[in-house]
């Protein structure tokens, strides 16, 4: 009867909030007896070390921080002005190197391991820096001591530092004068980016431009400035190289290609044809016209501006003729 009331060891005390392997899949027994069977079952995959240690456990059984990490931290305090000193207590809100890569450890152990890894990397950098300074000293010829075996294996150049300035026959050669640099014209609202030079920084279309951008349909995955710049470069190359005869008809083709086509190619509102229905830009007077298609309404849209150039009142009360 006494054996039935006493839970055998080992077992977990009821109220333990930690993890117990396969405990949620077993039912029908008390927490103590159930965890006892789970802890001694050889068929269950347990962690390599128990989280709950016996009371009589020795203090030397802790694995973290390791002896190597403590040695690195002590040596660091002797060599440099150490900001991080062991132990770093929990609650420290500052930055600790390599802290994010330490998992499954207490705060003191994780902080010690992170600082030890950082110090090991910095020691490697300091060693490489000393090797480079030592090699420069050997190549400069200022070292008066005999070179050792490891110094002979260092890669050496055929010259000595610092380099000595040489003045020879080239002193009498006249320097070539470069042509004066022509300053680029400043960008303005009347400048079209379509036919600017490919290396021009202003050859792109700003965000919010609602009209057609040539050769930009097949491009994606780039920012607006990069995408429109490459699209305009492809467009200008195509127009200059593939259709040079069509652009430059009536001109002397023996001369270099023109830098910009005629201004008539950039007309938006034509006198004899209307805008395409998908045009999302502004059309003068389109708001006050109705009863016809979009293409018929937008023919010669600038005439609306000429009619209302001297108008002082609203178009609704001016009783003007909109039959054009």
Swiss-Prot record:
**Main location as per UniProt:** cytoplasm
Please give an example of a GO cellular component term from this record: cytoplasm
Q: Where in the cell is it found?
A: Cytoplasm, Cytoskeleton, Cilium axoneme
Keywords attached to this Swiss-Prot or TrEMBL record, sorted alphabetically, are: Cell projection, Cytoplasm, Cytoskeleton
Task of the protein = Probable microtubule inner protein (MIP) part of the dynein-decorated doublet microtubules (DMTs) in cilium axoneme.
Family, according to the entry, reads as follows: Belongs to the CIMIP2 family.
Q: What is this protein called?
A: CIMIP2 protein GA14893
Q: Which organism is it from?
A: Drosophila pseudoobscura pseudoobscura (Fruit fly)
Provide the organism lineage as a comma list: Eukaryota, Metazoa, Ecdysozoa, Arthropoda, Hexapoda
